């Protein structure tokens, strides 16, 4: 059985995609939650291989035996994942989910979506949609759970799935209310 580390992403959408991939693999995984140092930007921007962006306790949690596979997302985690792969003597494979910030040869595999315009390369999988944990069983459970709430609403019904904040774009209560009005 392979040893898999999930380097927990710091944003909910990224975290969900990492966990969805882990769930799909069906193997046990160990989640490593990192705390980031404030005002440390250069390792991420410059594509370095370092632990400089995380605090000492987080760095101390990353020790041998090294994993066979590291799955992560987010620019802050990239230098750390490269460091893990380097410490393993190159044995740990690094899968990055979402937008890659470093050069593509920094990753063993990138699983991304079209909005990031990642070039086609042998180590890039470009999915139509983001990874998720929605299964037929979860949909059936939600249907049973929510049927009484929606039963009285007029048909046809339209569902809108919207993400959260992304960089300078925020999705607060006002934006959600406006989306609801405009979708009705």
Language-model features and meaning:
Residues 184:
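A conserved nucleotide-sugar
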Residues 1-5:
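Extreme N-terminal starter segment of soluble prokaryotic enzymes
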Residues 20, 83, 141-148, 181:
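Charged/polar, solvent-exposed surface patches and flexible loops
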């Amino acid at each position: 059985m392979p040893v898999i580390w999930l380097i927990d992403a710091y944003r909910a959408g990224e975290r969900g995609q990492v966990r969805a991939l882990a769930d799909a693999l069906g193997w046990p995984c160990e989640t490593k939650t990192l705390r980031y140092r404030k005002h440390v930007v250069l390792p991420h921007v410059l594509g370095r291989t370092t632990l400089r962006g995380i605090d000492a306790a987080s760095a101390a949690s990353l020790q041998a035996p090294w994993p066979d596979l590291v799955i992560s997302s987010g620019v802050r985690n990239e230098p750390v994942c490269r460091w893990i792969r380097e410490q393993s003597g190159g044995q740990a494979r690094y899968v990055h989910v979402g937008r890659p910030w470093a050069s593509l040869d920094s990753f063993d595999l990138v699983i991304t979506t079209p909005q990031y315009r990642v070039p086609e390369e042998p180590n890039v999988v470009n999915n139509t949609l983001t990874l998720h944990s929605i299964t037929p069983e979860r949909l059936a459970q939600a249907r049973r759970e929510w049927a009484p709430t929606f039963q009285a609403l007029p048909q046809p019904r339209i569902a809108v799935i919207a993400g959260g904040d992304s960089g300078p774009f925020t999705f607060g209560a006002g934006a959600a209310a406006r989306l609801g009005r405009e979708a009705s």
